[in-house]
A protein has these predicted regions:
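Polytopic transmembrane helical bundles with strong interfacial aromatic enrichment
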Residues: 9, 19-204
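Short, often N-terminal, low-complexity regions
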Residues: 4-13
Length: 204
């Protein structure tokens, strides 16, 4: 069990303390439920965000198939993309954001932590990534996808890099040095691009 005082100071207490009102423990219990819901919807959001660009790759490749095949495949892929975006990705993004803001409202102490401020910067980048992905999504539904399959394979890894950064920041907090963090992200980006290149070479 955690106390509210311990939560606000970034500490975890293993038992009830004298003089701490029961209401504060109840608040912390709610905080843990809110945190769990936040994590659940972040996971489902990224699941959608990972698969949307993959469907875009398939749509680009389907356009190069014979007309009889593309006329069947493309509408089905567009339907899958629309359902994934409207039923899973967007609702998960909204709920994940609501529960995340709720956590900060309960525990504003987090805003004084440097790791949280850096994490919020990556969340801002994620919002920009989401907006751009939405524009690609609308273009594909209108039959105007003008990028290559390789571009969307690379674009697909943008969410991966942001996810790695957010998870490491939330887990290691202030114990991670920003230089090592940047080196880790650049190394991951290099490995992802190398994997895409090797995959393309293998397919050819």
């Amino acid at each position: 069990m955690y106390s509210a005082a311990g939560l606000m100071n970034g500490q975890q207490l293993l038992s009830f303390e004298k003089g701490v009102p029961l209401e504060q423990y109840i608040i912390v219990d709610y905080y843990l439920y809110i945190k769990a819901l936040h994590l659940i919807f972040v996971i489902t959001y990224f699941a959608g965000l990972f698969y949307i660009p993959r469907l875009m790759v398939y749509l680009v490749e389907a356009a190069d198939r014979p007309q009889a095949e593309s006329d069947i495949i493309i509408p089905q892929l567009q339907l899958m993309m629309r359902r994934l975006w409207q039923i899973i990705t967007v609702p998960s993004a909204v709920l994940g954001l609501i529960f995340g803001l709720w956590m900060l409202w309960i525990n504003p102490f987090l805003l004084g932590k440097s790791w949280m401020l850096i994490k919020l910067v990556f969340v801002g980048l994620l919002v920009l990534y989401h907006i751009k992905t939405y524009r690609f999504y609308k273009a594909f539904l209108q039959g105007n996808g003008q990028r290559s399959a390789r571009f969307f394979r690379i674009w697909n890894e943008g969410a991966t890099l942001i996810l790695f950064a957010v998870i490491f920041l939330a887990t290691l907090k202030d114990s991670i040095h920003w230089i090592f963090g940047l080196l880790g992200l650049f190394s991951l980006a290099f490995l992802l691009l190398l994997g895409i290149r090797l995959y393309k070479r293998y397919c050819n």
